[in-house]
From Swiss-Prot:
One Gene Ontology cellular component: mitochondrial inner membrane
Transmembrane segments: 74-94
Segments in the Mitochondrial intermembrane topological domain: 95-197
The keyword Transmembrane is annotated on this UniProt entry: yes
Protein name per its UniProtKB record: Cytochrome c oxidase assembly factor 1
Protein location: Mitochondrion inner membrane
UniProt-listed PANTHER family: CYTOCHROME C OXIDASE ASSEMBLY FACTOR 1
Subunit structure, interactors included: Interacts with COX1, COX14, MSS51 and SHY1.
Keywords linked to the UniProt accession: Membrane, Mitochondrion, Mitochondrion inner membrane, Transmembrane, Transmembrane helix
Length: 197
């Protein structure tokens, strides 16, 4: 009976009242945490003491001099330019050596009796890296090339091909197609009825 009377005397706690109490508790906790953080920051700032209060706080370190090692940068740029130029030259030369005009020229040279008499069999490009000098532009109709060949007789020959045309509808007009080796110049136009172009 006494327990029942005490229970009746207590105020009823509604859900909204309980929620309000929880919100107040969380706000008080956040305020206390923020106050402690601000106090710690203030203590850390108080510990910083400037040697010269008239001068601003800065890092006492010399900045790098942009003019130093200028020669190294120039040398590196020159080496880079030479490497790029060499790579482009190799690419363009490879396109020339793989051209059908060069392949047809070598085909007719290998079948030339006069050329085989001087150079021998197995006629190929001379040198470790095949190189075609001059202009080889069939689109614009300009061909003026020179390259070196060699056979199994270890005699080096020079091939020269000069031709041009005015329009795409015309055929190439060959001005010179020859092989020079051992002091002799062989006219391939006189030997062949067909041309490499």
């Amino acid at each position: 009976m006494m327990l029942r009377l005490v229970t009746k005397g207590l105020p009823k706690v509604t859900p909204s009242a309980a929620k309000a109490v929880l919100v107040r508790g969380s706000l008080l906790h956040s305020f206390s945490t923020s106050a402690r953080f601000n106090n710690s920051v203030a203590e850390d700032e108080a510990k910083i003491v400037l040697k010269d209060k008239n001068r601003p706080l800065r890092i006492d370190r010399e900045l790098p001099d942009p003019t130093t090692e200028r020669r190294k940068r120039i040398a590196g740029f020159l080496l880079f330019s030479v490497a790029i130029g060499s790579a482009l030259s190799l690419i363009f030369n490879y396109e020339k050596t793989e051209s059908p005009i060069i392949s047809n020229t070598l085909y007719y040279i290998r079948r030339s009796p006069a050329t085989k008499n001087i150079l021998g069999e197995s006629i190929e490009f001379d040198g470790i890296i095949p190189w075609v000098y001059g202009e080889l532009n069939s689109v614009k109709g300009r061909i003026n090339i020179t390259f070196y060949i060699k056979g199994d007789k270890n005699v080096t020959g020079t091939v020269r091909l000069v031709a041009d045309r005015n329009t795409h509808d015309e055929e190439f007009l060959i001005h010179e197609w020859s092989v020079t080796a051992a002091g002799q110049k062989i006219d391939l136009l006189a030997e062949n009825t067909k041309t490499p172009i």
